[in-house]
Amino acid sequence: MAPRKTKPATKPAAKPTPASTATTSSCPSPKSFPIPMEVDDFSFSDSELSDAQSLIEPEGFSLLSPDESSGGRSQDELPPARKKRRVAGPKERRTQHLDLTPRLGFSDYGDQEPQLNLLVNTIRNHKKIVVIAGAGISTSAGIPDFRSDDGLFKTLQKKHNLKASGKLMFDAAVYQDEALTASFQEMVRSLSEEAEKSSPTAFHHMLARLGSDNRLTRLYTQNIDGIETSMPPLATQIPLNVKAPWPRTIQLHGSLEKMVCQKCRHMSTFDRVMFDRPDAPECPECVLTNQFRMETGQRSHGIGKMRPRIVLYNEHNPDEEAITSVMNADIRSRPDALIVVGTSLKIPGVRRLVKSLCSVIRSRRNGVTMWINNEPPSGKEFEDCFDLLVKGDCEEVARLAQLKRWDDDSKPIFDECQSADVERVKNEQGPLSVVITTPKKEKVQAQTGMLTPSSSYDGDVENASTTTLSNPASKGRKLTEILKASKKDAPKTESAGVKKPAPRKRTKKEPVKNAKITTFSKVTKAQKVTPEEKSVKLEEHKAMHPLPPGAARTNAPMLPGLAKDDSKSTPSGKRGQLETISPDRIPKGMGKLLD
């Protein structure tokens, strides 16, 4: 006989806590099942519990108790949920135009007030401004530009009888021809003299003021006259460093302030006397080096030629790497304003810089890009790059901005006045009279009724139940007396013989037929019914009588032999009465069935 299997011992069930009973109250108890079950049937082994927990917990996750997940803290003690940052939508951009050209000697731009406010507020309030300037900002100082009708390209062509444009005088090929070299030397010498005699304009001082206020992030200039760098706030560094820090002014095409040797790259201050000759001057550093080598018995390496440190067409810019680093750093800094002034943007590198800065600045909600020149920008790539196109002279822009000079550090002073000074000013100006008209007050109707009491107490309610209040409108009279007096004072009616006309009865409007819709959001009215159409009566139709139960549902007889096919009229009777129909004779074969 096989030994009897014993059930594993189970631990006594713990008493449920109030929290556990609340969560398990919806579960069925063992007594609710139809079949008898023992308490041992609800006991599980440790392996079964681990298998059930693995089904609930996915791989890589674990269930935490309330104490573990919240660190034993209640919901009120937990930190508030992190709010999401609201990102504003892109600002709607449109290009505005401002015309500052002189109008018959008048300088009133009242009809362009929004554009003027945008121009002035940008220059006065923005903190990270980038300016890209051309030769147009120096024309007021007496320095000619390049591409205008009176520019250098036109004048040099006529002066030196050049077959091509005067642009050839700024090409690197000038040192390959002796005649072009002589013309180039003369041009450089004259430009240096004009730059030395000129002084900064109002627009230059405005830029310097922005620099002294630390609101000018960078000034990219294409000029070689060096007027900007003559002011300390706009000083530059030659040569530029590849890494930061960089100066505030970046000279994209060099300057006439320096000259450099084409061989040893020796750089020194520009000397006009050395260029007062048809050929290029020799480098003094190369002369000393060559003399030392000759005295020591070494072979000569040659003597280099000096030239102004400016960038000509078809040659490499010595500061190209440093300028590229500065441009990339300024684009990453995300300026809030761009001013392109006095340039036609014919240089490809400058065009790329303007496009990159415009896209970055206009992505900012408060970013503003401005173009200041006598002509609009050329090319479809600049059609949607600027918020404001200013047509006019940049000197007028500086006058409208009304910024102090860069070297004017005086602060606005407010004089303190004593009472004696105030009386003196009053005596000088005379008595002041201010007429103040009082507005008409609207009449307020007096309240004749009883006011609602502000508060109610039990004592007041008891007193109100015992005492009666008199109506002030009755003036101490009773209600019956008032009614009798109103009947006596009633106006006399007219004689009974004259009858008043009966009031006109309102005729019901005829229902209008459904209107026809001919076009979208347009409804045509239905035509009115004429009296002739109203007189036409509809034909009266007899009512359809219901068939009695068991009657044939078709017009033809069910069996041809059961009834005669004669059109005899049925006896007249009342509608709704049943009639008995019997045949005159019995059909063949029916008698046998009946028997």
UniProtKB/Swiss-Prot annotation:
Transmembrane segments: none annotated. Residues 478-492, 530-543 have a biased composition (Basic and acidic residues). Residues 109-428 form the Deacetylase sirtuin-type domain. Pfam families: SIR2 (PF02146). Zn(2+) binds at C261, C264, C283, C286. Residues 9-32 have a biased composition (Low complexity). Its main location: nucleus. Binds 1 zinc ion per subunit. Its cofactor is Zn(2+). NAD(+) binds at residues 134-153, 222-225, 342-344, 373-375, 394. One of its GO terms (biological process) is pericentric heterochromatin formation. It catalyses: N(6)-acetyl-L-lysyl-[protein] + NAD(+) + H2O = 2''-O-acetyl-ADP-D-ribose + nicotinamide + L-lysyl-[protein]. One of its GO terms (cellular component) is mating-type region heterochromatin. The active site is at H253 (proton acceptor). GO terms for molecular function: histone deacetylase activity, NAD-dependent; metal ion binding; NAD+ binding. Its EC number is 2.3.1.286. It is found in: Nucleus. Keywords: Metal-binding, NAD, Nucleus, Repressor, Transcription, Transcription regulation, Transferase, Zinc. Residues 445-473 have a biased composition (Polar residues). NAD-dependent histone deacetylase, which could function in telomeric silencing, cell cycle progression and chromosome stability. PANTHER family: NAD-DEPENDENT HISTONE DEACETYLASE HST4, NAD-DEPENDENT PROTEIN DEACYLASE SIRTUIN-5, MITOCHONDRIAL-RELATED. This is NAD-dependent protein deacetylase hst4.
